[in-house]
């Protein structure tokens, strides 16, 4: 489930195989096994190319599934030439393997070759599947949805009189999600034999072994108990894959599942799961290869593909080269995850009843040092957020202080009812949602958590907070552990960001109150978080230097609570207020503040404008995404000037 961000490395030469070579391979009418094996070898080269060029993606799970996807699209999927609305259906429920699927679609001519240059770019191929892309049949989000979606598709197809086979690829870590098991029984009862689920059983979830998190036990027996026909094969042996599907041809009235034993990172020796040393975390779940890793990986993949082409009588494999765009990271940045990592251990040292729970994101959430220092107080719950939250509820009821972690997009949504239930009991749990907000933009909307404030902000006895700088991480966590009596949600931006201001010396944490980042008299701007406030700070600089307008920029780290007296004092005599959200405008902090300002009854009336996300988040580089959604520096300058102009012209709005 992780989303690792890479630091600066130099540009380097990348190699890909043009789609014309795949067409040459398919036109040669080779035996199906030979063609599929060669096609998959090319798809791995192009998957590596896309992820390296994009600077992020999921190599390990793409590589483990490519032999399966290649066989399905070359030999099982019917009527592909009739378009995505008329052919058999394939989609990945795990979603991380999107680059692998794109490489297959490009190789078949179902996506333009130039799309490979635009993985995780605005207007390009999204980091996770999105139905706006041709032949992508379902979006992904929290894991475990795939079989349920397939059932709905099967019933709709039957009602329309257009039955189609439906192939669903899942991960093995995904089987820890309860929805997967909920979805099985009714499929068997309804005899949905057109559904075939393939489990990419690569034995590794995110960064560690599945058996160390939630051992699947006798998986085949469990699946059979739900009424499914179960087969098993080597997921990298196209002959074995073919044999399994031919055996399934005669089974019409029973849903089918194929357990495909695979290797995460298959095709590159040092990326393959079995190469992990005992105790290590798997290094190639997310992120992108370094220059050296790319050179070594591409050499292995090219050697294999060239050998397969030559052995098939196709001659030399044609390739093309391109340069990986330079990615330059600022040298001095605020890293809130690293700060949280350190702050958590400090609090654990002081509070022996503090217990940490994780939902398969130990590295991304900064939990490795805690897990190493306090293994008895660390609970890895796997990809099972609802179970994790209810476990935290039980811990809290018996006197422990649970701190539960996941990405904000998952922690706020999937276990929302469990969080509400826990808070209703009056116990204390600290929830920590990382990867919060619009950035990073590369993973796409399924991971861009821009609705968590709205989802959790109305829960009684739950305080929401977001730090802007590393020092504030320490201060807020200490307050939430030591002082806050009720439950809380700490929202953490994961991207590193250069922040042009510091946490004020001697600043005391007061719920509902913030602090002035820079002072001014013409406009009050209130926001939170590192990149949002930093962009506003730079916008304020431009306003002052270019237009003579000064801005009072305020950091309010409390997302669902404001002290009215403090707010009135913070606004002062200024009657122009701009509210900012790293979140949907609807349901964000700005909505709460706009209502609070209206209730202050200021005279003369204050002009209030809001800026934030107003539509489904776009996928792209961070700069592209910020500009698209109007949250980059230039857009904020325009927004700030606009609200000042409206107020000056007498156009007063409290909900602009």
Question: In which residue ranges do the predicted regions lie?
Answer:
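Short hydrophobic beta-strand that contains or immediately precedes a catalytic carboxylate
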Residues: 170
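Alpha-helical transition-metal enzyme core signature, strongest for iron centers
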Residues: 173, 422, 578
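Thiamine diphosphate
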Residues: 2-167, 306-491, 496-497, 506-508, ...
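Active-site glycine- and acidic-residue-rich loops that bind
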Residues: 173-180, 234-242, 410-411, 467-474, ...
């Amino acid at each position: 489930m992780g989303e690792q961000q890479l630091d600066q490395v130099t540009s380097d030469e990348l190699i890909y195989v043009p789609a014309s070579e795949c067409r040459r391979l398919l036109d040669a009418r080779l035996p199906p096994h030979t063609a599929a094996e060669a096609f998959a070898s090319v798809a791995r080269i192009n998957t590596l190319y896309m992820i390296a060029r994009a600077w992020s993606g999921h190599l390990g799970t793409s590589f483990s599934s490519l032999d399966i996807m290649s066989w399905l699209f070359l030999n099982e999927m019917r009527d592909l030439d009739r378009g995505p609305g008329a052919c058999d259906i394939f989609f990945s429920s795990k979603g991380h393997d999107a680059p692998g699927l794109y490489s297959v679609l490009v190789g078949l001519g179902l996506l333009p070759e130039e799309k490979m240059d635009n993985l995780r770019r605005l207007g390009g191929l999204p980091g996770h599947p999105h139905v706006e892309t041709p032949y992508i049949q379902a979006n992904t989000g929290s894991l475990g949805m795939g079989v349920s979606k397939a059932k709905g598709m099967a019933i709709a197809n039957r009602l329309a009189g257009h039955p189609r086979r439906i192939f669903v690829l899942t991960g093995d870590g995904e089987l820890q999600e309860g929805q997967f098991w909920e979805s099985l029984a009714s499929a068997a009862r309804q005899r949905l034999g057109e559904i075939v689920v393939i489990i990419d059983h690569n034995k590794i979830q995110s960064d560690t072994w599945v058996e160390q998190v939630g051992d699947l036990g006798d998986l085949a027996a469990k699946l059979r108990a739900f009424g499914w026909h179960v087969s098993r094969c080597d997921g990298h042996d196209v002959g074995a894959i073919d044999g399994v599907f031919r055996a399934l041809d005669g089974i019409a009235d029973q849903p089918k599942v194929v357990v495909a034993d695979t290797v995460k990172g298959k095709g590159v020796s040092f990326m393959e799961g079995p190469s992990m040393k005992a105790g290590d975390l798997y290094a190639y779940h997310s992120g992108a290869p370094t220059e050296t890793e790319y050179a070594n990986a591409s050499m292995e993949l090219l050697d294999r593909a060239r050998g397969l082409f030559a052995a098939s009588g196709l001659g030399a494999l044609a390739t093309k080269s391109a340069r990986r765009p330079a990615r330059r990271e600022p040298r001095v940045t605020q890293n809130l995850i690293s700060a949280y990592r350190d702050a958590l251990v400090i609090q654990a040292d002081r509070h022996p009843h503090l217990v940490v729970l994780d939902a398969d994101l130990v590295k991304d959430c900064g939990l490795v040092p805690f897990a190493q220092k306090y293994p008895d107080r660390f609970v890895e719950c796997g990809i099972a957020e609802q179970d994790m939250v209810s476990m935290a509820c039980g811990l809290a009821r018996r006197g422990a202080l649970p701190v539960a972690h996941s990405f904000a997009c998952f922690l706020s949504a999937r276990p929302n009812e469990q969080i509400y239930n826990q808070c209703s009991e009056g116990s204390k749990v600290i929830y920590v949602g990382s990867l919060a907000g619009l950035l990073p933009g590369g993973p796409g909307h399924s991971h861009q958590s821009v609705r968590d404030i709205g989802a959790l902000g109305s829960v009684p006895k739950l305080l929401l907070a977001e730090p802007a700088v590393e020092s504030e991480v320490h201060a807020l966590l200490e307050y939430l552990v030591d002082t806050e009596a009720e439950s809380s949600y700490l929202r953490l931006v994961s991207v590193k960001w250069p922040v042009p201001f510091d946490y004020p010396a001697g600043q005391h944490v007061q719920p509902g109150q913030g602090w002035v980042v820079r002072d001014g008299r013409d406009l009050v701007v209130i926001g939170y978080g590192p990149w949002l406030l930093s962009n506003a700070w730079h916008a304020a600089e431009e306003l002052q230097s270019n237009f003579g307008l000064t801005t009072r920029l305020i950091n309010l780290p409390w997302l669902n609570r404001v002290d009215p007296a403090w707010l009135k004092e913070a606004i002062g005599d200024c009657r122009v207020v701009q509210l900012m959200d790293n979140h949907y405008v609807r349901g964000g902090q700005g909505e709460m503040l706009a209502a609070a300002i209206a209730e202050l009854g200021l005279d003369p009336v204050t002009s209030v404008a809001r800026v934030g996300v107003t539509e489904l988040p776009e996928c792209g580089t961070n700069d592209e995404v910020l500009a698209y959604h109007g949250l980059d520096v230039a857009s904020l300058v325009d927004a700030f000037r606009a609200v000042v102009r409206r107020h000056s012209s007498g156009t007063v709005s409290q909900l602009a």
